[in-house]
Amino acid sequence: MEMPREGDYIAIQSYKHNGTLHRNWRDTMVVKTEQNIIIGVNDRTLITEEDGRKWISREPAIVYFHRKLWFNVIAMLRPDGVAYYANLASPFILDREALKYIDYDLDIKVFPDGEKRLLDADEYAMNKKRWHYSEEIDSILRSTSFELLDWIDQKKGPFARKFVQIWYERYNQLRPDLDRSFFKGRENEERKILGT
């Protein structure tokens, strides 16, 4: 399938290794595409969980997906700064329905103060056994977790200081009907968010 264009809206679907739909984000605006990368923004979007529960996200988020990397990143714009949620996951595929990937349970959360925390190791161990993750997948995910920590420490890709500002501003340019900006009039908050 052809890559979406900037300004297009796509759905994002997260699956588990056994093929069940884990989570669906209804509207994500694409703000950048490259051969292997999609960057999008969702802002108060409808999210549907695997059990049918629905909720609306509280804050804007910049999402980063790569066709060759075994992780994706969500940068959440919060009043106290940017928090990152990095999912260890399969590279994405794209079809007419949605951008899709397999969520492999492990996550690394980066708090606005820079603290990093590995999440859901118990869920990973349980699902690895239950769904028979191969040694190859286990090895890929282990090496990817170190690669991801390097990206975080080196402020690479979605963890770069200006990443959030650049792509959130692009989102606002593509949505001229909105008379608001997360950064507008919030210079002190902006400095805090960007770590400057």
UniProtKB/Swiss-Prot annotation:
Domain of life: Bacteria
InterPro entries: DUF402, FomD-like_sf, Ntdp-like, SA1684
EC number: 3.6.1.15, 3.6.1.6
GO terms assigned for molecular function: magnesium ion binding; nucleoside diphosphate phosphatase activity; ribonucleoside triphosphate phosphatase activity
Cofactor(s) listed: Mg(2+)
Keywords: Hydrolase, Magnesium, Metal-binding
Main EC class the enzyme belongs to: hydrolase
Substrates-to-products reaction catalysed: a ribonucleoside 5'-triphosphate + H2O = a ribonucleoside 5'-diphosphate + phosphate + H(+); a ribonucleoside 5'-diphosphate + H2O = a ribonucleoside 5'-phosphate + phosphate + H(+)
One Pfam family named in its UniProt record: DUF402
Annotated positions binding Mg(2+) 2: D105, D107, D120, E123
Family membership noted in the UniProt record: Belongs to the Ntdp family.
NCBIfam families registered for this protein in UniProt: PRK13662.1 (NF010183)
Role description: Has nucleoside phosphatase activity towards nucleoside triphosphates and nucleoside diphosphates.
Name of protein: Nucleoside triphosphate/diphosphate phosphatase
